[in-house]
């Protein structure tokens, strides 16, 4: 059972992951503040700290070793619950944005037709 006494857990097998990024537009008025934010929000320690609240895999491999326990229960090792943990990432698929850009409309039509049956 999990921390709430429920008999279920997150399963990451077959997950689809995607990549994100931060952008500072050329000519930004607050460039220094934006750079400070990006440095803070992508820092190894910050990403590891975020993982104590929610099982989002940190964007930096350097954060993995620093992931601690769940913020309200020291008996739960959050590293085991990350989608990026070695045991959870073996069958992960990277989202193929080109495929979806080319096929989303057709597949959505087919899916909606199937749903309406």
Q: What residue ranges belong to the model's regions?
A:
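Ligand-binding pocket segment of bilobal, Venus flytrap-like solute-binding proteins
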Residues: 1-13, 23
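Alpha-helical structural elements
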Residues: 7, 17, 48-51, 95, ...
């Amino acid at each position: 059972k999990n921390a709430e006494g429920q008999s279920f857990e997150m399963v990451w097998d077959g997950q689809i992951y995607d990549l994100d990024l931060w952008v500072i537009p050329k000519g930004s008025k607050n460039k220094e503040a934006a750079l400070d934010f990006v440095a803070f929000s992508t820092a190894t320690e910050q990403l590891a700290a975020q993982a104590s609240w929610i099982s989002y895999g940190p964007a930096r491999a350097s954060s993995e070793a620093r992931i601690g326990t769940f913020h309200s229960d020291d008996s739960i090792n959050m590293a085991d619950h990350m989608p990026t943990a070695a045991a959870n990432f073996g069958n992960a698929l990277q989202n193929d944005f080109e495929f979806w850009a080319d096929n989303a409309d057709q597949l959505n039509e087919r899916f909606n037709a199937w749903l309406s049956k």
